[in-house]
Amino acid sequence: MLEEDMEVAIKMVVVGNGAVGKSSMIQRYCKGIFTKDYKKTIGVDFLERQIQVNDEDVRLMLWDTAGQEEFDAITKAYYRGAQACVLVFSTTDRESFEAISSWREKVVAEVGDIPTALVQNKIDLLDDSCIKNEEAEGLAKRLKLRFYRTSVKEDLNVSEVFKYLAEKHLQKLKQQITEDPEQTHSSSNKIGVFNASVGSHLGQNSSSLNGGDVINLRPNKQRTKRTRNPFSSCSVP
């Protein structure tokens, strides 16, 4: 375990074409709500949720990035400092599927090879699917990413995506601490550890995340009851 007065904070970016369900996914996970109304994200939005992963308190800071090309310069700037990534495409949007490799390259160019999950959203619309199962699974294998099929509408596998990424980051964090214990106390460290006793971040300052056009909505910390999902994830060995 980490030190008792330390809190892990993980910056996750949710990336993909417009209208694939990125905003809805974050709203569902952080606030437990779903709306059919589509509102284009202007630049970047931000929500957070506090969870426990393997008995560790973890704060997930979820960044919803615009999928339109006109916002590309803005969203790329917000990739910096990200410690995990969700790549999302829609079951009913072939173009969003074909764009995944490009989105992946943009993220890697800014932050390197961080824990990443590939998500096929809107599986409640499988009857209208534009992507074959083997195509989606093949893409995950080529990119060497954990693959999930989700339905934000039905709340299927949404929590599993973020939990997986949190676990992967914690593994990386603990490995870094083992290799260099002093790293968690360095003001230049960027692995996302907060000193809970004084509320200070030892990497990227949380107050700096809320400037400019970012909307900082703090969700109710009430936890929602987990439901058993009939769809399982597909992982790459």
Curated annotation (Swiss-Prot):
Short sequence motif named Switch 1, residue ranges: 28-46
Topology term for the membrane: Lipid-anchor
Cofactor(s), by name: Mg(2+)
Tissues expressing the protein: Detected in brain neurons (at protein level). Forebrain and midbrain.
SMART domains referenced in this protein's UniProt entry, alphabetically: RAB, RAN, RAS, RHO
Catalytic activities: GTP + H2O = GDP + phosphate + H(+)
The protein, known as: Ras-related protein Rab-23
Organism per entry: Mus musculus (Mouse)
